[in-house]
Amino acid sequence: MMAKKRIYEVAKELGIENKIVVKKAQDLGFDVKSHMSSLDDKQVSKLVDSFKSANTTKPSTEKDSKNSSRKEKTKIKVSVGAIRRRDNKNDHDNRHGNNKRRNNKFKKQQNDRRAERNKPQTEAKSAARDLLNKFKKKQRAEASELNAQTEASRRKWHQEQNPQRSKVKKVENTRKPKEEKLEGAAAVKARVQASQKPVGPKIIKPSPARNKAKRPTVKKVEPIAPVVPAPQKEETKPTRKKDFTRKKREVPDYERERSEHSDKARRRRNKKNKRINQSKEIKKQPTQRKERPLPETLVYEEGMNAQDLGKLLHREPAEIVKKLFMLGVMTNQNQSLDKDTIELLAAEYGIEAQEKVHEDISDIDTLYTKEMEESKASKHQEKRPPVVTIMGHVDHGKTTLLDRLRHTNVSEHEAGGITQKIGAYQVRIDDRLITFLDTPGHAAFSNMRARGAEITDIVVLVVAADDGVMPQTIEAIDHAKSAGVPIIVAVNKIDKPGANPDHVMEQLMKYGLVPEDWGGDTIFVKISAKTGKNVEELLQMILLQADVMELKADPDQKAIGTVIEARLDKGRGSVADVLVQQGTLKVGDPIVVGDTFGRVRVMTNDKGRRVKKATPSAPVEITGLNDVPEAADKLVVFEDEKTARSVGEQRAKNALEKQRENVQHVTLDNLFDTMKKENMKEVDIVLKADVQGSAEALQQSLEKIEVEGVRVNIIHSGVGAINESDVTLAGASNAFIVGFNVRPTNTAKSQADAEGVDIRLYNIIYKVMDDVEAAMKGMLEPTYEEKVTGNLTVRETWKVSKIGTIAGAFVDNGYVTRDSGIRVIRDGIVKYDGKVASLKRFKDDVKEVKQGFDCGITIENFNDIKVDDQLEAYEMQEVPVK
């Protein structure tokens, strides 16, 4: 297979541009398109021969101007390397001479035909080119003459300055005329042979600057510059002179024009680059940094370093360090500085130094007071609903009055007919809202009444007309007066026989409550909560009193409030009933409540509907806290959850440390008292209640029971159902468990039976106190004991008119009878305690249903039965006295 070469390789060997070789190959009839086209050996030989025959020097005549111009162009294009390579290939060319002659003949015929077609255009171009060449030759001759004169004057000057160097120049100058006479490829070859250094195969291109007739200068012609301002330029002149003399030859017109064009472009680029560099130099000039003014006051903290002070003073840390060094203080940028040094530095700068006062963000009580004062001073205050607390003695009709206002029936579902936790409700009257707080009237709930008086605007004191002033009535008056809250007296039960409202008014005058009809300033309204008589008048008096007080709040600030009640719910976790006092509480707000923290996850109003925000004076129920807060704890909203978490954790830590400090250790001073206490008998109790307020009230009431030689010790108090941990704690402490409105879980009940732990369950507070006191005195005479006979699970419910709700239940264990007592337990909380109304098996009435069977059951006066409710059947059995 014959080896092939590409066009650019042939052009490289010949030292000719690629496009000229491509053009020549196309003229020879070769199928080539670009410099990447391939040629075989024969085609390469023809192509090289064509260039060789074109380079052969012939006497030019006027008739053959076209051939002479082509020879001149080709002669200039050939490089030294190409000539040398062609000389080395003479033997090869002689062997193939016949083929070359045939190819040259064919090529000549093609050129003749092409010349005939382009003869007019070619003759015009040749004439123009000849005129241009003559003009440029004349310019070069004038430039050469000028250069010769300049060279002679310089040579004379150099001879005077340095005779030895002038001799060397004579030798070089004597060579110059000989080199100028050489032309074309023969001149290049003669110069290469005369030089000592071998010349590589490079294309010889004249410098554009040297081909211009107008730009020949002394620097381009003179090989050695005179020793005037810059001696370095003198050494470079001989090389430039040699290059100029070597390349002083005829150049094709199109290359000369292209060189001139590229020279202009180069000059434009140089000017542009010069401008860019100058602009960059201008930009690089560093701008002077403007110093910021010093602050009027330096608010510092002890322990700051130079970097911290530099930021406050708007100065570099190095400047601060230098200033301190001048003041005699050796320090670095990271070393802490004391108070005196910082004040000395501030005095040096001529500004006042003020130490920063740290606020304890964990003290939310102070923060609560501050927010309250800011809200009162705010200019964006709006009217808010009044908060009214209903107070009075037990069973005087407080909850019945509230039921009348809300059109509900809360009092019938309360154990023993008494309220044992604070309830918060909001009522709309004549397009205005009133928030009511229902407080317990029992003596054990004194703290609840005190909390209700602290967060309220108006106190409605309910006094029964047939009962008169009672101890809790007097206590409520004291709470209201200590809180500075106005009192409106509602004399209730005027519809009952034997009611004497005037007698009640006379009794209240002893405590400073004088009716307006008798010349006083206390509003008295005679009402009947049961029939609704004069209730509307009472509401009008409440609104009138609220208008006089001009109750306002700023809804735009961060919310603050107070916990009314708190409990632990099985499905929702910690639940807190909160009264918003200032600002607007929104879902998602990070909050701290007492020693707990969290984010408001779900918020519901008093009607059980979910809300997104709570405005001032609105009672809401919130979830999302990490633990159950205490009743009366303050609620404060923080900027972010991270801050709220840190504050809550710090408060919990402080509370734990305070609890540890309260533990008394045995010392010589209290040794005798400690021995007396150890000799006393203790009744250990684990107390569990449904809400935090009830647990707190029970604990305080039980601890107040005084029996000589015996005392009550509450080892644990909490909210929620009785669980296994409570039973374990009671078993380890030899205590019994008191459950108030709660029930034990099945696991806890089984564990208590196995370990013999006594669990007492109550739903009325005074029964707890009576039983504990009787047990302490040793006079507990059990007459009847409650015995649980069975447990049922509600699987389906049906509502039947005139009958109520029928529960389809399955007896899990034990049995249930038609005469059994029944409790409805939902999520561990007792919802109702009553009696069985009817018991059926299929369609037949039965007396008893045992374990493993289904039954239909209805409960007296209770229809709110739901699927998965637990029913507990029990009987009261007589227990003999031991």
UniProtKB/Swiss-Prot annotation:
Keyword set includes Nucleotide-binding: yes
Subcellular location: Cytoplasm
Domain tr-type G stretches: 383-552
Region called G4, residue ranges: 492-495
Annotated region described as G2, given as residue ranges: 417-421
Major site of localization recorded for this protein: cytoplasm
Region (G5): 528-530
Positions with biased composition (Basic and acidic residues): 60-71, 84-96, 109-133, 169-183, 232-242, 250-263, 278-294
One GO location term (cellular component): cytosol
Residue ranges with Basic residues bias: 97-108, 264-277
Ranges that cross the membrane: none
Spans annotated as G3: 438-441
Stored Pfam families: EF-G_D2 (PF22042), GTP_EFTU (PF00009), IF-2 (PF11987), IF2_N (PF04760)
Lineage: superkingdom: Bacteria
UniProt-recorded Gene Ontology molecular function terms: GTP binding; GTPase activity; translation initiation factor activity
Amino acids binding GTP: 392-399, 438-442, 492-495
Region annotated G1, chain positions: 392-399
The name this protein goes by in its record: Translation initiation factor IF-2
UniProt gene name: infB
